[in-house]
Amino acid sequence: MEKKYLILVMLLSLFIVNGQNNKTVKWINENAIEIENANPDSELTIFKNNTPNKFANAKIFGFGEASHNTKEFFDIKAKFFKYLVKNQGVRIFIMEDEYQAESGINEWISGGNGNIKTIAKNFNMYFWNTKEIVNLLQWMRNYNLDKPKENQIRFYGMDIELGKKINLTIREFINKNKIIVEEDLLKIADSCSNKMIDYTKFNNWWQYQIPKLIKLKKEILNSEIKDKEYKSVIRSLNYLIAYTEYASKVKSKFPESTEFRDLKMFENVKWIVENESKNGKAFIWAHNEHINKKEMWSTGSSIINLGRHLKDYYKDEYYSVGFDFGIGKINGFVVDKKKGNHWKTYDIIKPFKKTYAKTLMSINKDICFVDLQKAIENGSSNFFSKKNKHILIGAGGYKPKPLHKIMISKIYTETYDGLIFVKEISKPEYNWEK
């Protein structure tokens, strides 16, 4: 009797769960905005006719990615950037890369010197050296060719993980303007700029250099030079100071360095918006964990990220878009003492259990945009407001062993303003220049 009762309870529970899933899928089928394809050069026609009000009224758009090495994420983000340029007046493109990338890229996309086959060498992040991203830079260049300078697209880096060459900018400015500065301070700037971060061990050398860099900044601030180059060199010094501070924290108790990096990215975005954007609008290209409006990693972590700072400061003027996927091919970095470390391509053939993707694979659209504000207001069986699993794929790519380490809990309505779901993903095109 007890066995029959347990079977009955299990069947009833299964019936209820299936009913809830059917209700959720029906709501998503009826309310999600279809994205026609992942072609970055085609128009977002359906989205344009159904643009969520919060999206239309926003000024700063954070577009994430569930991994740093997925063709569809890159192409769809490029597609949305072009849409925002054409329809909402966005001209500022900010990337999860270093400040040093700006000069070469901006010269090329504004019609100046450069080579399409080498333009991506300006990036510090290996992941951006793909045909998909170079094609986007080419589109920016073509767009800018017949535009006055004040209406051209400009590229900016917000990250602080590299100090290389910043010292050269500082020395050039000081020599050109004949500013009297202690040579020892300039040598400190040289050392900090040229020294790479060793993430494996603590080095207190970095923290002793910070007050010296601040002193150098004060000496430049006290000069009588206040032109455009002055503003640029102060910005360079701020990046170098931030890099040095970050380097001093990499072996601190978690999550100090993680939060510091995102705080500095927020400060850099804020500076760019306030000083370089004529209409206060900007597009941010980064990982989901940086641009989401709540926190890093699992729900409840309280690790404050870039997107949380942006949402707290800009309120509804900041719009966060996350990405998720179901199946497909993706790269992962393998540490192998025998064969040597290498990248491996994995084929995810079905969505994982207890994930948002498991349910989203049942909808009638291959790619869609979900307005999460609408999901909150109109139901969807509260699917997006319930905690569910999500695959976290960071800089090391897909690492399925052990799987539980990359399965994190999220509540999507708390995490993003909008969600883009892609049923099947593939690898971007690396080594394209050959």
Q: Each predicted region: which residue ranges?
A:
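Bacterial Sec-dependent N-terminal signal peptides
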Residues: 1-24
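Structured catalytic-domain cores with a bias toward divalent-metal coordination
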Residues: 20-434
